[in-house]
Regions:
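Iron-sulfur-cluster electron-transfer modules
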Residues: 1-180
Length: 181
């Protein structure tokens, strides 16, 4: 369908929201205004097909930022995969997971894009939002970024902890269908 008709504005917005919020943080404020303004909600319904009566998820004022310095890999190391929803909308979940793992005696290494990634500051994404809206090439690109970041973690033999079940399952299911893994 996307190849024949193109990707709708609505699908571009929802599938690409993690990338858009990273590149244009002011969109978070716009979402808040839309949720509080009946006029903006009506415009959103007309332009994007999002029901005016529905509240959109509000991005956090400050997204999750992993620690600037990662600990040295040790015997009690664990890798934490912070999904884009937790990182951008509910960073307290990622911080709580990190705190629980620290309290359990683990050195927590937050998975990040590799240094040679085209956008090393942009958070990792499993690509499921793209895939769910038929944007297979974009999903494959996100999956490749995630696989590249996972490779050193897998090679270390340390456990990898994910927060969002659908992201973890995308590694097992979707990424294999995309020809990865």
């Amino acid at each position: 369908r996307n190849a024949a008709l193109g990707v709708s504005r609505r699908d571009q917005l929802f599938a690409g929201l993690p990338r858009l919020l990273h590149r244009r943080p002011w969109l978070g404020a716009l979402i808040g205004w839309r949720n509080r303004s009946p006029l903006l909600a009506q415009l959103g319904e007309r332009w994007l097909g999002v029901a005016a009566s529905r509240q959109l998820p509000q991005p956090a004022a400050r997204p999750y930022l992993p620690p600037a310095i990662a600990p040295v890999l040790g015997e009690r190391s664990v890798f934490l995969l912070v999904d884009t929803f937790a990182g951008l909308f509910q960073p307290h979940i990622a911080m709580a997971a990190q705190a629980v793992l620290h309290a359990a005696g683990y050195q927590v290494h937050v998975l990040r894009p590799l240094a040679d990634d085209a956008e090393p500051a942009r958070p990792l994404c499993c690509g499921r939002t793209y895939l769910s809206l038929g944007q297979v090439d974009a999903a494959r690109e996100e999956a490749r970024r995630l696989h590249a970041a996972l490779a050193p973690a897998l090679a270390s033999g340390a456990p990898i902890v994910g927060l969002e079940p659908s992201c973890i399952l995308s590694l097992r299911d979707d990424h294999l269908k995309l020809g990865l893994g």
